[in-house]
């Protein structure tokens, strides 16, 4: 009889944990909203969120107008064909440093999800580079998988013998 009460107590405790986990899942399941675009970190957050939401038109607007900018079709295809695959990663934005009034860089970490039960994943630290164009912050560099290696890369000139 005493063992039955103990077992029932354990089962009730487990049931309460399951109900709490399901409730938290549905409460926190709301969609993230875009933030302000007047700061470098706001632009980086909105770019990453647009990529996550597959809103490639919006994400493309955050790219700087410079030589080597990919066409919209190239940009979109990079994500649709999974050349750039952000499905198992997230972008964490750290400190932002403005140098002057027209350029900034931010410390960023790309955090990759683990692939197994005991694999906690890994992260890669890098930086994002932004410039101010026509009063708006635009991105000129982000680490892979949020950026194509060939974007904004100058075309090499052939060496004359």
Model-derived features: positions:
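Short, low-complexity N-terminal intrinsically disordered segments enriched in polar/charged residues
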Residues: 2-53
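Generic cytosolic/nucleocytoplasmic N-terminal low-complexity/intrinsically disordered segments
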Residues: 1-2, 101
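Exposed beta-sheet edge and beta->alpha loop/turn motif
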Residues: 99-161
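Short solvent-exposed beta->alpha transition segments
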Residues: 42, 46, 56-107, 111-112, ...
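Alpha-helix initiation/capping motif
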Residues: 2-4, 71, 142
């Amino acid at each position: 009889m005493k063992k039955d009460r103990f077992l029932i107590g354990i089962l009730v405790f487990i049931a309460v944990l399951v109900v709490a986990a399901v409730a938290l899942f549905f409460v926190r399941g709301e969609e993230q909203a875009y933030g302000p675009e007047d700061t470098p970190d706001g632009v980086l957050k909105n770019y990453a969120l647009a990529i996550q939401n597959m809103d490639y038109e919006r994400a493309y607007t955050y790219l700087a107008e410079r030589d080597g900018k990919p066409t919209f079709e190239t940009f979109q295809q990079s994500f649709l064909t999974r050349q750039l695959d952000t499905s198992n990663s997230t972008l964490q934005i750290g400190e932002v440093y403005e140098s002057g009034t027209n350029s900034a860089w931010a410390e960023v970490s790309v955090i990759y999800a683990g692939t197994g039960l005991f694999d906690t994943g890994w992260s890669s630290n890098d930086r994002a580079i932004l410039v101010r164009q026509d009063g708006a912050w635009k991105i000129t560099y982000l680490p892979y998988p949020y950026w194509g290696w060939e974007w904004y890369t100058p075309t090499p000139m052939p060496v004359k013998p």
